[in-house]
């Protein structure tokens, strides 16, 4: 994970830009300059597709935590009001056979899910939130996973 870090300064490095829809002006606004103290642990981490791929596998198979802690985090519960195939553990989302997590904040959204049976990982990063700050990363992940692994999806 050479290109992942916890942001401590306003703004993002390099040429990366993120956009959110402003319903008043009916235009996309650049949300790139953000104060990492605001999201803190909920969104100040910056990473790349190539770093998130091995992280998703380690998150779901272990190697980051002690075995007992990993076993506890893998226990999951159904989410109220959601289909039965969606479950949440301790910092993990289970979508049927897929294990991983997602996040959306300030013009950016990500999905990273690992499919243990196939040793496959799908990572989606999107730098735009659409109307009402809705992300397309979930929709993209659900579509790609259904095309590549139809036998492992419940959607």
Which residue ranges define each predicted feature?
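Catalytic loop of the DD-peptidase/beta-lactamase superfamily, centered on the K-T-G motif
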Residues: 17-155
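Active-site helix/loop module of the DD-peptidase/beta-lactamase fold
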Residues: 1-18
């Amino acid at each position: 994970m050479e290109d992942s870090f916890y942001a401590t300064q306003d703004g993002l490095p390099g040429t990366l830009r993120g956009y959110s829809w402003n319903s008043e002006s009916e235009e996309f606004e650049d949300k790139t300059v953000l104060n990492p103290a605001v999201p803190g642990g909920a969104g100040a981490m910056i990473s790349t597709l190539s770093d998130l791929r091995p992280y998703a596998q380690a998150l779901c198979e272990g190697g980051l935590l002690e075995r007992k802690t990993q076993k506890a985090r893998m226990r999951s519960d159904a989410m109220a009001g959601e289909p039965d195939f969606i479950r949440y553990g301790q910092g993990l989302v289970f979508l049927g056979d897929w294990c991983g997590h997602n996040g959306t904040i300030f013009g950016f959204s990500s999905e990273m899910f690992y499919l243990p049976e196939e040793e496959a990982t799908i990572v989606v990063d999107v730098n735009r939130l659409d109307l009402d700050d809705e992300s397309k990363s979930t929709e993209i992940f659900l579509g790609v996973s259904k095309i590549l692994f139809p036998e492992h999806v419940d959607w």
